Amino acid sequence: MKLNQQTAALALCTLLGVSVLAGCGRSGDFSELQPAVNKIEYTNLNDSGSRELLKELLSDTGVPDGRIQSFFRRVDRFNDSVKQEWLTDGFEEAELLYTKYDPYAMQDEWTAKNGTFPGYNCRITAMSLFGDFLSVSADSQINAGEDVLFVDEEALKTDPDALGGSSLADFRALYSSMKAEDTTEIKRHVQTVQEEWASRGVTFRENERIRLITVFFHDKPTEEESLLFVGHVGVLLTAEDGTLYFVEKVAFQEPYRMLRFADRTALSDYLMGKYDTSWGQDTASPFIMENDELMD
C-alpha cells in the first residue's frame, strides 16, 4: 500500500513534527477555526518534580515498574541529546503551537549524538506505557509492508526493547493503517476502526485511570484508495483529584511532553488545534478515539 507524500509526512508524526505542518499553510483571517484552548501547560520531564509526579501517576494506574523505567531511560536519552534551554524547567505555559526550539536545529542536535537512528515517536512511546492494558489475539498477523509504520519498524529493529515488553505483532495490530470508506462522515470511520480492531483481536483492558488517546487521519492516496491511519497517539492519565495528564512524544526528533488539562474538552481542543489544519478537503477531519470509543 503506497501512501501519498502528505500521508507519509503526517504518519511519521514527522521527523520534524506534525506540529510544524499544523502551524503553516494558513493565511488570512481564520479566527473562526481557532480552538477554544489557545494556551497549554506542559513539561518536558527534565526536572525532578514533574518526573516524580508522572512516575506516581503511572504506578498508581498499574503500569509495571519495568515499563516506567524503560520509558524514563528513553526520555533521558532524548533530553541529554539536545540543548537544555530548549526544554522546560517544570511545567510551563505556552501558546498552543509554540515551541522553545527550532525543530530543524533539534534534529541536527539529535543526529550529531545518535547518528542515523531516528529515535522514538508517539506510537512507540504510547505502546511502551500502555501495552499491559491492551490485548491482541495470538493469531493476529498484520504485515505492515509499505505502511505508515516503516520508520517505526526501522527504529524497533535497532531497539526492540523500546516497546517495553509488547510485541511487534501487537504494535502492528494496533497501528497499521485501515481500508476505509470514501466518506467524510466521522461516525462511519469510527465504526471502521472498531470493526477493524475487533477483526485483529485488539481489545482494551478497562481502567478509568489510564486511557489510550488516538488521533486518526483519513487519506486518499489515489482515486481508488481510502484509508485511515494513526497520525498521533498518547496516554491519558487521571489523577485522584480528577486532573488529566496527557503523555506524548511530539515526533521522532522532538521532545517528550506531559500536558495538564482540566477536562477532556481542553484535551480535544489541544489535539484538534494541532492536527485539524485543513479545510475544504474531500477527506474526513481527524477524529479522536479514547480506547476504542470516540472521545466525547
Residue map of PLM features:
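Cysteine-nucleophile amide-bond enzymes
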Residues: C24-D296
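Core hydrophobic alpha-helical transmembrane segments of single-pass membrane proteins
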Residues: T14-L15
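Bacterial N-terminal signal peptides that target proteins for export
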Residues: M1-A11
